[in-house]
Amino acid sequence: MTSNFRHVALIGKYQASSAGAIGESSRQALDGIARFLQHQGCSVAIEVETASNTGLLHYPSLTVEDIGARCDLGLVVGGDGTMLGIGRRLARFGTPLVGINQGRLGFITDIPFDTYQATLPPMLEGDYEEDSRPLIQACVMRAGQVVFEALAMNDVVVNRGATAGMVELRVEVGGRFVANQRADGLIIASPTGSTAYSLSAGGPMLHPSIPGWVLVPIAPHTLSNRPIVLSDATEVAVEVVSGRDVSASFDMQSLASLLHGDRILLSRSAHCVRFLHPQGWNYFATLRKKLRWNDGDP
């Protein structure tokens, strides 16, 4: 078979234990995928941290920047968290990503591990569905200076401390004052993140084709304070008015401690994450499967 993707990078979440050991099954799984790709005519490299943690050093290893510059495809083996992390880092290169699920839900790593040998060959020949997901560009402003910057694919969450009371947050959209919200926190989620923490907090699911965000209060003091869907073409600003131990998290993978008066500015990034799915993939089938809709129906 001649693959449309000649240079493929494998990225996995295979963290070494405190003793430096790693499960043999995890190593074998990644090695098996690499050998399979080689049999499909692909040149295979492994992301450098993945290679180090698995001990798979007989393949070329590449940094994320090298993957973006030199590889036609990234194959992510793990769960949604693994995909979120690498997706943010590769978005600026436009490298397409395919996910093989070894996590739990697998909303964005949607190929089951036990089916990859049947699913991948048609995709490597160009038979796939492409799906672009926008990123949120966020920065924390303090006294007029940027003190923290991050990208998020899922969400930005402003939270109170674990032992603190409610926070008060001033919310502006497009430079217009919306409200001061008293709550345990506030979630600003993309369509991708609308099926994550936002959904658990009572927010709606946004179809990935919708160019919008959803603002979801966490346990608000006022019951009329409900989620609101916004266009992602406008900037959202969230200012910390009061509260102790307030922080902002970005995809739950990076964290910024906040002070009173800090402003979190959010806008749509210029970069998108490119997902490739098996032919016939659709969003509603994913919802049915992952959320177990219609379980028990004949």
From Swiss-Prot:
Subcellular location(s) per record: Cytoplasm
UniProt protein name: NAD kinase
Lineage summary: Bacteria, Pseudomonadati, Pseudomonadota, Betaproteobacteria, Burkholderiales
Primary location: cytoplasm
Enzyme class: transferase
Keywords: ATP-binding, Cytoplasm, Kinase, NAD, NADP, Nucleotide-binding, Transferase
Residues reported in the UniProt entry to bind NAD(+): D80, G81, N154, D155, R182, D184, T195, A196, Y197, S198, L199, S200, A219, Q253
NCBIfam families, sorted: PRK02155.1
A biological-process GO annotation: NADP biosynthetic process
Disulfide bonds listed in the record: none
Superkingdom classification of source: Bacteria
Function noted in UniProt: Involved in the regulation of the intracellular balance of NAD and NADP, and is a key enzyme in the biosynthesis of NADP. Catalyzes specifically the phosphorylation on 2'-hydroxyl of the adenosine moiety of NAD to yield NADP.
GO molecular function (one): NAD binding
Gene3D superfamilies: Probable inorganic polyphosphate/atp-NAD kinase, domain 1, Probable inorganic polyphosphate/atp-NAD kinase, domain 2
Family to which the UniProt record says this protein belongs: Belongs to the NAD kinase family.
E.C. number: 2.7.1.23
Active site: D80
GO cellular-component term (any): cytoplasm
Reaction(s) the record says it catalyses: NAD(+) + ATP = ADP + NADP(+) + H(+)
